[in-house]
Amino acid sequence: MANISPKLFQKAIQQGLKAALFTTSTAAIMLSSSGALGIAVSGVIATNNNAAFSDNVGNNWNEITAAGVANGTPARGPQNNWAFTYGGDYTITADVADHIITAINVADTTPIGLNIAQNTVVGSIVTGGNLLPVTITAGKSLTLNGNNADAANHGFGAPADNYTGLGNIALGGANAALIIQSAAPAKITLAGNINGGGIITVKTDAAINGTIGNTNALATVNVGAGIATLEGAIIKATTTKLTNAASVLTLTNVNAVLTGAIDNTTGVDNVGVLNLNGALSQVTGNIGNTNALATISVGAGKATLGGAVIKATTTKLTDNASAVTFTNPVVVTGAIDNTGNANNGIVTFTGDSTVTGNIGNTNALATISVGAGKATLGGAIIKATTTKLTDNASAVTFTNPVVVTGAIDNTGNANNGIVTFTGDSTVTGNIGNTNALATISVGAGKATLGGAIIKATTTKLTDNASAVTFTNPVVVTGAIDNTGNANNGIVTFTGDSTVTGNIGNTNALATISVGAGKATLGGAIIKATTTKLTDNASAVTFTNPVVVTGAIDNTGNANNGIVTFTGDSTVTGNIGNTNALATISVGAGKATLGGAIIKATTTKLTDNASAVTFTNPVVVTGAIDNTGNANNGIVTFTGNSTVTGNIGNTNALATVNVGAGIATLEGAVIKATTTKLTNAASVLTLTNVNAVLTGAIDNTTGVDNVGVLNLNGALSQVTGNIGNTNALATISVGAGKATLGGAVIKATTTKLTDNASAVTFTNPVVVTGAIDNTGNANNGIATFTGDSTVTGNIGNTNALATVNVGAGLLRVQGGVVKSNTINLTDNASAVTFTNPVVVTGAIDNTGNANNGIVTFTGDSTVTGNIGNTNALATISVGAGKATLGGAIIKATTTKLTDNASAVTFTNPVVVTGAIDNTGNANNGIVTFTGDSTVTGNIGNTNALATVNVGAGVTLQAGGSLDANNIDFGARSTLEFNGPLDGGGNAIPYYFKGAIANGNNAILNVNTKLLTAYHLTIGTVAEINIGAGNLFAIDASAGDVTILNAQDIHFRALDSALVLSNLTGVGVNNILLAADLVAPGVDEGTVVFDGGVNGLNIGSNVAGAARNIGDVGGNKFNTLLIYNAVTITDDVNLEGIQNVLINNNADFTSSTAFNAGTIQINDATYTIDANNGNLNIPAGNIKFAHADAQLILQNSSGNDRTITLGANIDPDNDDEGIVILNSVTAGKKLTIAGGKTFGGAHKLQDIVFKGEGDFGTAGTTFNTTNIVLDITGQLELGATTANVVLFKDAVQLTQTGNIGGFLDFNAKNGTVTLNNNVNVAGTVKNTGGTNNGTLIVLGASNLNRVNGIAMLKVGAGNVTIAKGGNVKIGEIQGTGTNTLTLPAHFKLTGSINKTGGQALKLNFMNGGSVSGVVGTAANSVGDITTAGATSFASSVNAKGTATLGGTTSFAHTFTNTGAVTLAKGSITSFAKNVTATSFVANSATINFGNSLAFNSNITGSGTTLTLGANQVTYTGTGSFTDTLTLNTTFDGAAKSGGNILIKSGSTLDLSGVSNLALVVTATNFDMNNISPDTKYTVISAETAGGLKPTPKENVKITINNDNRFVDFTFDASTLTLFAEDIAAGVIDEDFAPGGPLANIPNAANIKKSLELMEDAPNGSDARQAFNNFGLMTPLQEADATTHLMQDVVKPSDTIAAVNNQVVASNISSNITALNARMDKVQAGNKGPVSSGDEDMDAKFGAWISPFVGNATQKMCNSISGYKSDTTGGTIGFDGFVSDDLVLGLAYTRADTDIKLKNNKTGDKNKVESNIYSLYGLYSVPYENLFVEAIASYSDNKIRSKSRRVIATTLETVGYQTANGKYKSESYTGQLMAGYTYMMSENINLTPLAGLRYSTIKDKSYKETGTTYQNLTVKGKNYNTFDGLLGAKVSSNINVNEIVLTPELYAMVDYAFKNKVSAIDARLQGMTAPLPTNSFKQSKTSFDVGVGVTAKHKMMEYGINYDTNIGSKYFAQQGSVKVRVNF
């Protein structure tokens, strides 16, 4: 079945249904009129405006016919179950209660509306174009039940559930109702907006495409069983209720905002679905408050939920782009899940929030974002890529055991955010990766942390049962502490881990457990009962000097665990008591090991400065090692000592000192720079069977020949020199192998004393003296493993068994070498005999094959084989003759290195390997005297001088051969039999050199591929090519003649001969002196390869025929062609069965086409008729590749004909290219035979090429592409191919259709289509943008035209089928017929720009033209548009213009004919319009600029959109029925869109029954409204120019953007006036039920607005208030809140912060002074105790840096804040007497304050300079004291306050108001205390005091905003506080240090703390803005802890203080350093 458009098919069905309905209706009418049916039509038609259902028979209704028209018979209003039709543009009132209307037909009218005055049911509503507005009266309902209607019964047909005619619906009151249901049921779709305060009830699947409640929110939207799809951007209803278990609510708009709550009112939880499918969806109220929903589904986009209650079984994020944001504190009851792809979806909490269920259970979310506030997560599963704490006040608490899959991060300021675990918990990801958290708190239970990064100021274990386990390698940045009871808490590391801070600083932990991995501990204090290494891989590193209090033990398997010390360190307990450690590592410094037990596999010295000393005779169990830089570290033994393990195994120690006595080293490895024998009695014995001593052994006594070295092991080794300073007495090698690595060996004798004795020199060595065998003959082994020299003989007394030469060169200077075998054992082994030598024995390679070098430097003899076991790498023969007598010679290469080099093989021999000349070229002689085999190449590097093959000798060459001469003796044979490679592939072998005596020689080719390169190959008498072998004769060096007294035998059917010119510098020739005979029928292969430059195959005698194969007998099976090959006509190829032209070949032959089969691969085969006409069989030509080319060519100077005997047909479509090349201009190539190019299968391309002519009559072309690469003219008939131009000069005349595309291909050719010639494919211009001309000489159908320079049409009707973006330089009319343009034809180009006739244009369905359409000289004809059509430049026409759809003109429009605007069309003009006439019935005209409209115009139901533009009208115009004017009234300009009727013109509106004026008011500034703020819509220059409609027919709608401005309209003059209504709007907003009635601080906000409203015009206050008019009420309230001042100012915050700073820093200093004063007084009564050496110091200076923060939560609607303070205090004080101290201090503090809640965005920065005087008086010899502090604070405050402004209607932005002012404060504090001395050195000090403060704020004015800069007056106020508390402290003496920890608590009661109101106002306000105030808490609590360490004159302290009040928390940490002098 043919493809049918779905739309076409639908239209056909509709037309069929209409025809059937018409037939049925007609029959029914006929039967009815005849009385056959006996029924009347149940429908009526309204005939007058204001008709009502209750009308009796009168003038408002007529009976209706089945055809849908009035029959003239008056009727009653529609009855129950009737239908009715609008007969005009009427208002109809449904005023009969409970009436059921089957259907309503709007028909072709523009109805004013349907008023529902009584409960009414309406079935379907259909229309002919316009929509029916409906208004439902308060308390009444409209039910849509979806009934259908049929023409026979109702006068029109309407399908069920069809409301395409229903427009906007207005609900007239709170209980006006719209009910949507369907009897079917089926889906009902409503297109219009629904407004009003009523109720919508949906009982079926329904879609509401418009907005709901946009102007006036609905009371309720009820969703019953079904899917309610709300597609509008605005849905406003108090509650949207899901009333049925099957209820589904879907919001689809990209920016949907549902204002109100969504609830499940079924009474059953967990039913009902909410789908939020838009990119930005918003629900402002609670969800599921009454009963939980089943699902909230968030699609691709962000859902913003503003309710405090969200209840649903699951809130699902279903898409990668899903996100949900809770904008307020919320309780989410249920789970939040990602049901899309893993690691997508974002959940954001912006206040204190709770989620009761799991998060990300199905798939992990991308992000959980926690803003300012605490997120309490109760689920057992939390899965998200990252849980982010984004604010200083962010906190997350997991209230149950939980698995948190993903990371937890602080993305706000560093060291903020709290994470609390209250049960067994797991976190899989990092914590604090971006910025560190403040605290990780672990309660009772185990916290399992899996991240690699844990960053928090402190990780606190707060309970006896607290435990934290790090399951992966981790870096813990911060401290780990036990803040519970001492010796509790467990920390477990299970991977490589780092802790940067102390562990157990507050209280010791029970256990630090180090599992598999390294624990790097950076603290100076590590306190734990036991530090346990529990795993084989456990390790702990102390990175700083440390005191480890407690034991270190290995509780795992023995000999595991590592302990590392990196400074002077002390361990108080045992090490390895339970099980030995693997390693004790000692870094830079001295390790003092205090335990009674030291057990470790290895004690490692890791640093240059490492040292360990064993002071007594010791047995060290384990090894001692240096793992630092080599040759560092000292171990000292001072008596008889034993070490059971190795010493210096990793790196050598610097020194091992052996004193008097025997040092028995049992380890296999001893490494030290020097092992020193320091005493005459020193003896060093290595007992290990495999002892290796790395380093030197020296005698440092100063006396030669003392000291003994015994190498008693089976394998002993010394790597360094022996006896370098003073010689040893003896080196004795017993039964075993001694390996000596030194370069100096000094001993009288190195003796091999045993049959099993062996000595190995492992490094280059000079052995001065002999090496001898003093035992039995043929025993003893000497091994050299580096470059070595032996100056004497080897084996002189008795022959050695073996001399082994390892890696390196052994130089033997002696003339006698006796050894059973000299073994070359290594790849780098080499032996050089430096003098003539007789080697008695064999030379062998016992290492890897093809390694080892033997060099002879004079006449030499070897009696045995060489390389018998494995081939050597090289036998090198220098100047002289090497006589080799062995039958086996194996070496990779035997090299002749000198001009005088020669080698003679004296016996038949197998030479395994190559023979090569590595000296000068053409030197060296090789002689074979018997049948010989050489497995490798001969002469590979350089050609040899001569290769002699003796008489009768057969030389088998296993490789290539290259010699200057190859001399054959009589009856000699050279056979090449080289193997394949390891993969079974042929290796190309070569045969190079001049052949002497070749006439007697035989060449056997028994290798797969052999190439001969010398022209003398033609002299060899016989060449035999073996089975499966290929022999090549290459002419690269010059021309070659073959077959001259020469036999070439193909010994098998698969033997092959190659004739080639692979590397020749030009085209070379291979000439045949005779026929080349095939071995049999279809046997043998011949290959021609032209190589780089080409090969000619011809006869050695010109004109003498030579045959390749026998035409009538034995033919060669295959001829293969490679590269460029030309066969001369002398050589006949008919003796070839198959010709294969391979890839990239260029084969030319005029004889090959008679071969059996010709197969063309990706190559070219040229048949040239240059010598005459040709008859080509053609059927034997095969295209084996899609790009195979066949060239039929005439390159002669004559006309030629090529006659085809058969079709040229590829095997598959789109394969093969045929090029027809007529080379010579004026000459012709004729293709005869009447055959087809591309028969059953089409060719890929047919190319016409050349400068000559073509004759193709009778020839058919079946191809994909026809390419025109010609310079002349060509005429083609019908073709299915694509046609492509390749030359600018192409001139193609197409006489038949083109079935493919036509491509100008960036060429400026011309293609002419004859009449009725069509192009089925695209006309395009690949690679170009403005090339080529297409001329259509008559009618034509074109598919798509794009990219060409010119299209000429018009001689006949032309249709272009496809549109889209089209570039045509110009379309020109060649006649006045029609050019039909397809849908969406978007032309970049012009029409009739440079010429052309009046071509008619028909835009079928939209499009555009970028250039001019016609000019004054070259106008176009008729213009018809439909769809969206636009013209970017001027339009000039002289026909009839019919404009439909949406048509826009960006430039002038001129038409000398009539213009008709189609019904429902929209036409937009941007510049002047000129026409004869306009008809605009039911059409819209938009004016985009002020312009002149010059034309008569008539219209009915016309809409004119003026905007703010003036239309100057010239002509005669009249409008009837409805006229709609859309205008814009610009308040700033005090003008708007209007029509000015020019003098002499008229505009008649008297026939307009409804003048609808729609005004959009913009830029209305209340400051500029005056009596002249008005404008007139239509005016005339002369009287009578305007004929108005009666004023009662004028209806005005005003769209206003400023809530504080309203308008009035004078219908008689069409004039609009503006007025200020702000006062009333404010009252309504705050009245009961108003949007701002119940907001926080409502009274203050209202008062603020009233003050601003009362300000004078032009003032800042009035300007800001005007801007608020663009906001919604809630936005307005927020903006006002940001202006109003809270009672708590930055100065109040600073006062609190500064009081805490002073109290903490100075008071702590006074505490220390009090302690010193007590000692001074005590010292006056008795002696000074230890640690009190500073008693004479009377003065002190101190410094105390500090950091702190404070948080105030929101209180009584007053915004909270967060402050951060840093700074420092310096002070100086002194004793005035023993009882009185006075001091002064200076404090600098910098504080950042960030406000929250209503003031979010406000920030303050404060610089404080505080100057203090302080004093302490202690009653002599009593415990009573009094302290006093007086302070002055100078504060510079910079504030940045957010101001809210309206940027557009109901859209806000922000500006920043900047303030800069000073605040001063004066504070005095007096405190008294009494110290009680308690047991155990504990002091208890009760304290009581008073504090008084005065604060003075300076006045200032803000800058930075447009109208919202406040002027703030200064204020003064006082505070008075009482203080009561206690302090506990104790002095602890630790050596010379006195530690004083203290804890204090204080109650602060404010007797006076009331803060005065703030006077802040905008310019123009007569009174200040109200101040938001609350009653501040009276009571707060101060708690602090600190510790002071005193050492002599220095004191060091650290303190932590907190201040806690109602919703207030502040904390400060400080350190202090004090020096007393």
Swiss-Prot record:
Stretches assigned to the Autotransporter domain:
1734-2021
Q: What is the effect of changing R76H?
A: In strain: Indian tick typhus
- SMART domains per the UniProt record, alphabetical: Autotransporter
Which positions carry the signal peptide feature in this UniProt record? 1-38
Q: Which SUPFAM superfamilies match?
A: Autotransporter
Q: Does the keyword Ribosomal protein apply?
A: no
Keywords associated with the record: Cell outer membrane, Glycoprotein, Membrane, Periplasm, Repeat, Secreted, Signal, Transmembrane, Transmembrane beta strand
Effect seen on changing D1245A: In strain: Indian tick typhus, M1 and Moroccan
> Which Pfam families does its entry note?
Autotransporter
Question: What does the UniProt PTM comment say about this protein?
Answer: Glycosylated.
Which top-level group of life is the source organism from? Bacteria
Q: Which GO terms describe its cellular component?
A: cell outer membrane; cell surface; extracellular region; periplasmic space
Relate the protein's function as given in its record. Elicits protective immunity.
Its family? Answer: Belongs to the rickettsiae OmpA/OmpB family.
The identity of this protein, by name, is Outer membrane protein A
Species for this entry: Rickettsia conorii (strain ATCC VR-613 / Malish 7)
The gene designation is: ompA
